[in-house]
Amino acid sequence: MMEPRYQEIPSSESPTVEQDGVWVRVIAGECMGITSSIDTKIPITLIHVKMKPESRLVQQLQADLNGMIYVFGGGINLENETRVKKSPIAFGIGAKQGIQDGELALLSEGEEIVIKSQEGAEFLIFAGPELNEPIERYGPFVMNTKEEIHQAFSDYQNGTFVN
């Protein structure tokens, strides 16, 4: 199990960049030539994106990471052959897939996604490795077993949860 750790990173310290109608805040990972300021123990990506109408973003993702996009304003199209693995939303698989406000797209393996917005959009891009291990959660804790959950609560209550 990974040792627990915490980083206090105010949003003012998360780098942002804007060009060609696309604004991004890089919380974790890299986008448009800027890299986040946080130290991650595993390769993850978390990018907040705002796109003006008729803008386009090309984002690289590590091929071995699971990627997803959550749109919470406007809509976007995936312009290349990025495919959706599974999705609770109704749209087909293939090029020029539309993702609208409130929808989540889980992306297939690939190293590049091309995103275009006709109307303007706001969304998050996430990517990270597949865990391939059991997940147990309760309250603010996520562990592998109920025993680990109980230990986490005990450590928290005893003041030994974080060094």
Regions found by a protein language model. Give the residues of each.
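Jelly-roll (double-stranded beta-helix
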Residues: M1-N163
